[in-house]
């Protein structure tokens, strides 16, 4: 039996890529799409909803969310309340919101996934960086995205820093008496690590994790040149969350 999928934010670039992926997979069935600004009532024969409240009680298994940080938490909560296992690629969640959604998913006996990045290479980058941080505590992150991205730093950069902080010796990166001649020049501070965000047209999603030690350096980098790179992870997420009973944060938990 096919997994019935709702896609929220279907008009965006990620939403459109997700729609095409679902439509070409015989194991998946796109049963509804959501966008508050869509004027048509159907898209390729699929019902279009403008208000998520109208989807309450709808027959579906999975809610895929590529909307905006402003509504992602409410959408995920709504999905869980209505029996849809959420697969969320929208970023901007606080740690408190993620913890609350995990607890609520267990109460609902529903699987779910919030993933800062669906590209398998990016997930591997985070794992490799975590291993390296045990031995190279001096590290900085540079994340680069298209100029339409609304949050900074990226969810991938934050997740990478969180994972490294769990194993890394907690030290302040840079000179103890350094002075910023322009505010923000050294980037955001996460547990002593610096995170730098670049926003330029022509980019999609890229990240470097740069480690330094006496007489040597190590650079890890991942590049997504096209949004199709995320669809393997989205597909995996859809097929895995229906088997599970709680929400997880990070695609690595499903690999």
Curated annotation (Swiss-Prot):
One Pfam family, short name: DapB_C
Reaction(s) this enzyme catalyzes, per UniProt: (S)-2,3,4,5-tetrahydrodipicolinate + NAD(+) + H2O = (2S,4S)-4-hydroxy-2,3,4,5-tetrahydrodipicolinate + NADH + H(+); (S)-2,3,4,5-tetrahydrodipicolinate + NADP(+) + H2O = (2S,4S)-4-hydroxy-2,3,4,5-tetrahydrodipicolinate + NADPH + H(+)
InterPro entries: DapB_C, DapB_N, DapB_N_CS, DHDPR_bac, NAD(P)-bd_dom_sf
EC number: 1.17.1.8
Listed CDD domains: DHDPR_N
UniProt binding sites for (S)-2,3,4,5-tetrahydrodipicolinate: 146, 155-156
Enzyme class: oxidoreductase
BP GO annotations: diaminopimelate biosynthetic process; lysine biosynthetic process via diaminopimelate
Primary location recorded for the protein, binned into one broad class: cytoplasm
Cellular compartment(s): Cytoplasm
GO annotations of cellular component type: cytosol
NCBIfam families assigned: dapB
Function: Catalyzes the conversion of 4-hydroxy-tetrahydrodipicolinate (HTPA) to tetrahydrodipicolinate.
Name of this protein: 4-hydroxy-tetrahydrodipicolinate reductase
């Amino acid at each position: 039996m096919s997994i019935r999928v709702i896609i929220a934010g279907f008009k965006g670039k990620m939403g459109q890529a997700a729609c095409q992926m679902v439509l070409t997979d015989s194991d998946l069935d796109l049963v509804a799409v959501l966008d508050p600004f869509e004027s048509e009532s159907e898209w390729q024969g699929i019902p279009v909803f403008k208000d998520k409240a109208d989807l309450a009680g709808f027959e579906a298994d999975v809610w895929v969310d590529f909307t905006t940080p402003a509504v992602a938490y409410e959408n995920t909560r709504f999905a869980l309340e209505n029996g849809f296992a959420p697969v969320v690629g929208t970023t901007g969640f606080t740690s408190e919101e993620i913890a609350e959604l995990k607890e609520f998913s267990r109460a609902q006996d529903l699987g779910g996934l919030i993933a800062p990045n669906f590209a398998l290479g990016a997930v591997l980058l985070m794992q490799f960086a975590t291993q390296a941080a045990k031995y190279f505590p001096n590290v900085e992150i540079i994340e680069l995205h298209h100029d339409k991205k609304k949050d900074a730093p990226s969810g991938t950069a934050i997740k990478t820093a969180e994972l490294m902080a769990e194993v890394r010796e907690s030290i302040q990166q840079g000179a103890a008496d350094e002075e910023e001649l322009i505010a923000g020049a050294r980037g955001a501070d996460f547990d002593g690590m610096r995170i730098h965000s670049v926003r330029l047209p022509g980019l999609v999603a890229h990240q470097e994790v740069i480690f330094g030690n006496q007489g040597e350096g190590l650079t890890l980098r991942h590049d997504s040149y096209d949004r199709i790179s995320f669809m393997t992870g989205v597909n995996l997420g859809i097929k895995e969350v229906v088997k599970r009973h709680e929400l997880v944060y990070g695609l690595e938990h499903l690999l």
